[in-house]
Amino acid sequence: SAPRGCWTKSYPPKPCK
């Protein structure tokens, strides 16, 4: 259940600000 928004393709994935 990830929050909406764009995510980086790095690992671990982090929400982009």
Curated annotation (Swiss-Prot):
Q: Where in the cell is it found?
A: Secreted
Tissues in which the UniProt entry reports expression: Expressed by the skin granular glands.
Q: What is its main location?
A: secreted
- What are the disulphide bonds in this sequence? C6-C16
Of the GO CC terms on this record, one is:
extracellular region
The chain residues annotated with the modification Lysine amide are K17
What are the UniProt keywords, alphabetically?
Answer: Amidation, Amphibian defense peptide, Antibiotic, Antimicrobial, Cytolysis, Disulfide bond, Fungicide, Hemolysis, Secreted
Q: Which InterPro entries match?
A: Frog_antimicrobial_Ranidae
Any matching Pfam family: Antimicrobial23
A Gene Ontology biological process in which this protein takes part is: defense response to Gram-negative bacterium
Q: Family assignment?
A: Belongs to the frog skin active peptide (FSAP) family. Brevinin subfamily.
User: What is this protein's function?
Assistant: Has antibacterial activity against Gram-positive bacteria B.megaterium Bm11, S.lentus and M.luteus, Gram-negative bacteria Y.pseudotuberculosis YP III and P.syringae pv tabaci, and antifungal activity against C.tropicalis, C.guiller-mondii and P.nicotianae spores. Has hemolytic activity. The mature peptide inserts into the hydrophobic core of the bacterial cell membrane and increases permeability without disrupting membrane integrity. Probably binds to the outer membrane surface before aggregating to form transmembrane pores.
Q: What is this protein called?
A: Ranacyclin-E
What does UniProt list as this organism's lineage?
Answer: Eukaryota, Metazoa, Chordata, Craniata, Vertebrata
